[in-house]
């Protein structure tokens, strides 16, 4: 069955007096019934996310197969444990995102209580990507690591649920001419054609005046990554 609607997951954020001044504390989704029209004409149904015990559903990757819609995310604030939730497509595309199934202890199950806290898939970040690479026959996860002048790393898995490899750091950005830089939100864009996988990341500054004045930052930076398959592994 073909589904013509579009589902977008949204973060709920509020101001705080520490750190970078805000944090995520919940999630919403919006169901757009006519996504092929101009955005100003979209018919949108906002769906308030249910209790997910600090897990921000859909803050990162969203995928689907023939039966289910899957959403990754991370526990906020700060701890970033990663889980995977799913809904039947028929339910998701009619706006029913209640009662998702969680991948917990090797099986799909509903989660009704905060404790016991399930084992996460891995420790991730608020924003990252997951996609399937048909040439490698692997799921690939890309994220930024570290808060500040960090690195970009990759994990791989045979399935959406894992087991995921340990992260491999493959790129360290440079920040010429940027005062007090920090890097975040690395993710892959497999939909872009090229001899490899295009990856974007963002650069910002802890110095607000630098953010306001430096027109080279706060725009996505692109790199091209090529993965060479090792037949012995």
PLM regions and their residue ranges:
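Charged/polar, solvent-exposed surface patches and flexible loops
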Residues: 190
């Amino acid at each position: 069955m073909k589904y013509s609607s579009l589902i977008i997951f949204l973060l709920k954020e509020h101001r705080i007096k520490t750190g970078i001044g805000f944090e995520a504390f919940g999630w919403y989704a919006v169901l757009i019934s006519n996504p092929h029209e101009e955005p100003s004409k979209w018919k949108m149904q906002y769906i308030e996310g249910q209790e997910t015990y600090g897990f921000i559903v859909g803050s990162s990757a969203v995928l689907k197969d023939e039966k289910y819609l899957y959403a990754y995310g991370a526990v906020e604030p700060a701890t970033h444990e990663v889980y995977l939730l799913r809904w039947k497509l028929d339910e998701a595309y009619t706006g029913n995102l209640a009662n998702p199934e969680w991948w917990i202890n090797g099986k799909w199950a509903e989660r009704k209580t905060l404790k016991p806290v399930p084992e996460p898939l891995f420790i991730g970040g608020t924003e990252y990507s997951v996609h399937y690479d048909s040439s490698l026959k692997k799921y690939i996860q890309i994220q930024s690591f570290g808060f500040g002048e960090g690195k970009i790393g990759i994990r791989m898995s045979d399935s959406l649920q894992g087991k995921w490899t340990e992260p491999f750091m493959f790129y360290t950005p440079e920040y010429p001419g940027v005062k007090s830089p920090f890097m975040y939100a690395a993710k892959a864009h497999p939909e872009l054609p090229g001899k490899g996988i295009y990856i974007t990341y963002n650069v910002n500054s802890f110095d607000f005046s630098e953010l306001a004045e430096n027109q080279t930052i706060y725009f996505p930076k692109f790199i091209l990554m090529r993965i060479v398959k090792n037949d012995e592994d």
